[in-house]
């Protein structure tokens, strides 16, 4: 009798989670990762689950949709959440991680698992048989991307994504910045804040909107747009002189202890590694040329002599028309046993990508074991996210973060307090998941 087996292509957040979930269910997994032998424009290492943009997994509370999504995943035994919590760094009310330690932890867990065999090579074609999870990401290599296009018969959609610069903390002028979390969240001093006066802000704004960009010049990219949730800072600025002050440079919830007043605008720096030597510029993903980044960002008080350990970069992300191609189980409508997961399916965000991998990994293992895939309840964040990407209008399909608006409304009288209403939705989700999991996944949730 053939031993149950799953092939996972890609060891990013989704692929790593898929491999882990399948292996936990007793299935043998072959995990393919092309890095470091074949790399991409934005990856720097051969580690699994490397974070190429922010180091933040966003909000942590149950009044936040992504906080609920993370809690569901944690209770389901998510490797990504386990390692994120293990390697968390101070970030106020958010969950941020030490980038390299997190990726190293994920890599170690997968390479040491007795049910997982890692193969470091590029996969250029979709395996013709067996149970397969494709989680090769938005930067899928050209040969595999073409193979997926041939299989689906659909042209991929695309958008630009960008990452923020990282600075060496030793080169920040600490006399000009102050430590404080917005509204005192977290430990109260998790962020470094670079305050700007009105005059400094206006000069910075003018320099930013006139700086030279480093956009790709491929004709095929002419119509590609940015994902709204990850707009480059210069694109936000072009929406109006005050757009930044209501976006990544908003000063609300911050008082400069040296003046006793709220600054006109603020640039926040968030710890990027466990040692506290690297900080990233929060919300400052950018498509500017590197020389322009150095010139413009050094206008920010405290960063006049800053050394950038990584400049912001831009890259092209591709995704599928999942409403036409996938079931809410992550399985292909065209071929039983073939699953897709991660950002390439039209979810946006680290946590959302990993959640898709969790679903695909569980269901791929079930297929390998001769069981039917399961669809997560709509009342859960996981179920609502997978329902959205497989039921949205395919002609106007765009990447989506998890949001409470994707979830069914509460029954009964409306709860008018927004925070209470969101928490009630989260509590309902966790109750439904707890009741559903034992009968459908064969095991209770983690505490």
Curated annotation (Swiss-Prot):
Reading the lineage from the top rank, the first entry is Bacteria
Which cofactors are named for this entry? FAD
PROSITE patterns from the UniProt entry: GIDA_2
Stored InterPro entries = FAD/NAD-bd_sf, MnmG-rel, MnmG-rel_CS, MnmG_N, TrmFO
E.C. no: 2.1.1.74
Instruction: List the GO cellular component terms.
Output: cytosol
Record GO biological process? tRNA methylation; tRNA wobble uridine modification
Major enzyme class: transferase
- Compartment list: Cytoplasm
Main localisation: cytoplasm
**Which key words are in the record?**
Cytoplasm, FAD, Flavoprotein, Methyltransferase, NAD, NADP, Transferase, tRNA processing
**Pfam assignment, any one:** GIDA
* Binding locations of FAD: 10-15
Q: Which reaction does it catalyse?
A: uridine(54) in tRNA + (6R)-5,10-methylene-5,6,7,8-tetrahydrofolate + NADH + H(+) = 5-methyluridine(54) in tRNA + (6S)-5,6,7,8-tetrahydrofolate + NAD(+); uridine(54) in tRNA + (6R)-5,10-methylene-5,6,7,8-tetrahydrofolate + NADPH + H(+) = 5-methyluridine(54) in tRNA + (6S)-5,6,7,8-tetrahydrofolate + NADP(+)
Task: Give a GO molecular function annotation for the protein.
Answer: tRNA (uracil(54)-C5)-methyltransferase activity, 5,10-methylenetetrahydrofolate-dependent
Record PANTHER family: GLUCOSE INHIBITED DIVISION PROTEIN A (PTHR11806), METHYLENETETRAHYDROFOLATE--TRNA-(URACIL-5-)-METHYLTRANSFERASE TRMFO (PTHR11806:SF2)
> What family, per the record?
Belongs to the MnmG family. TrmFO subfamily.
As for what it does, the entry says: Catalyzes the folate-dependent formation of 5-methyl-uridine at position 54 (M-5-U54) in all tRNAs.
List the NCBIfam families hit by this protein, alphabetically: gid_trmFO, PRK05335.1
Q: What is the official name of this protein in its record?
A: Methylenetetrahydrofolate--tRNA-(uracil-5-)-methyltransferase TrmFO
User: Origin organism of this chain?
Assistant: Symbiobacterium thermophilum (strain DSM 24528 / JCM 14929 / IAM 14863 / T)
